[in-house]
């Protein structure tokens, strides 16, 4: 049973990685160490998470000459933040991430959000030319925006990282990305129950009794069933945890398969629910905080 996908760049990207968004200072280093010691070979981070230095401290203990792992055995992703989209700022932002992480190159560098993006993409392509990153990709882009990038790209995006879980199955976007040889990575694949803006009336994915019933049949946890569902669709998952036992549990999804019937059943849970869009109150109603930005990606159907 394959544990990785092959990107259009030829790189092998492990299907399950450790996410580090919302991991509190002081916890990230131990989480990364627990992940690497437990078999993870894929770490996902970003400048805006504010914890690349801690990730780097952990990598320094386990990766490199004389350490447990060679650099080419660990796939490391980071992301360019919105305030660094000026082409003049892109290389400096990338080098800053590399310094914090203690690395000479990134396996993958993503544009975190589609703000002004065509000139930014060209600057990111230069990072590939200079050997600072092996490949570049996108995050939170809709189908139209992906097409816009591909139309001008010298180095095509290899990944689009988006929110993806049974309540937001992204079937249309996944199909579009497949047709372009763009791999989809799922962030918040377990529904991000600890997101800062969650309200009590929102549904809890992990507590869905239908998932619980499926998990019981396979003698797995609901989290493992969700991750397996995405993995079987060829979607890379980066669940975040700082708990060693959960970090291990999330990787144990390669010793069972869901039946086609159960895959279809979980597909049917889709309700196009996005958890990862900060909302604000406006005229007594909740609205998407960045919804009026000209490049806001979620007004399109997918």
Predicted regions, residues:
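Short acidic/polar active-site loop segments enriched in Thr and Asp
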Residues: 41, 104-107, 134, 158
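CE4/NodB-like, metal-dependent polysaccharide N-deacetylase domain
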Residues: 90-110, 126-130
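N-terminal binding-site loop/beta-alpha segment at the start of enzyme catalytic domains
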Residues: 1-74, 190-193, 293-302
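Acidic-and-aromatic substrate-binding clefts and catalytic sites of carbohydrate-active enzymes
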Residues: 22-26, 46-54, 83-88, 114-117, ...
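Short, well-ordered amphipathic alpha-helices
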Residues: 53-64, 94-98, 124-125, 146-147
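Short, acidic/polar
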Residues: 23-36, 85-101, 144-147
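A short, structured active-site edge motif that brings together acidic residues
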Residues: 70-84, 107-114
């Amino acid at each position: 049973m394959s544990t990785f996908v092959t990107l259009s760049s030829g790189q092998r990207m492990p299907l399950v990685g450790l996410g580090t968004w919302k991991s509190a200072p002081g916890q990230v280093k131990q989480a990364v160490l627990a992940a690497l010691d437990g078999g993870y070979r894929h770490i996902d981070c970003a400048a805006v998470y504010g914890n690349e230095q801690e990730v780097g401290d952990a990598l320094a203990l386990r990766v490199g000459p004389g350490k447990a792992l060679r650099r080419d055995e660990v796939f490391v992703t980071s992301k360019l933040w919105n305030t660094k989209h000026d082409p003049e700022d892109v290389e400096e932002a990338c080098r800053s991430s590399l310094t914090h992480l203690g690395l000479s190159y990134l396996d993958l560098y993503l544009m975190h959000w589609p703000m002004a993006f065509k000139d930014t993409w060209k600057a990111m392509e230069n990072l590939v030319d200079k050997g600072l990153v092996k490949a570049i990709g996108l995050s939170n882009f809709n189908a139209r925006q992906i097409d816009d990038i591909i139309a001008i790209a010298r180095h095509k995006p290899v990944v689009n990282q988006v929110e993806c879980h049974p309540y937001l199955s992204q079937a249309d976007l996944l199909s579009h990305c497949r047709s372009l040889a763009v791999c989809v990575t799922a962030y918040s694949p377990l529904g991000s129950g600890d997101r800062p803006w969650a309200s009590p009336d929102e549904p809890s994915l992990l507590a869905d009794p239908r998932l619980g019933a499926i998990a019981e049949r396979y003698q797995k946890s609901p989290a493992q069933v969700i991750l397996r569902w995405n993995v079987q669709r060829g979607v890379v998952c980066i669940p975040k945890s700082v708990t060693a036992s959960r970090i291990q549990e999330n990787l144990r999804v390669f010793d069972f398969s869901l039946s086609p019937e159960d895959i279809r059943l979980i597909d049917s849970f889709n309700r196009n629910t996005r958890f990862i869009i900060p909302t604000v109150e406006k005229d007594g109603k909740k609205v998407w905080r960045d919804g009026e930005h000209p490049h806001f990606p979620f007004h399109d159907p997918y």
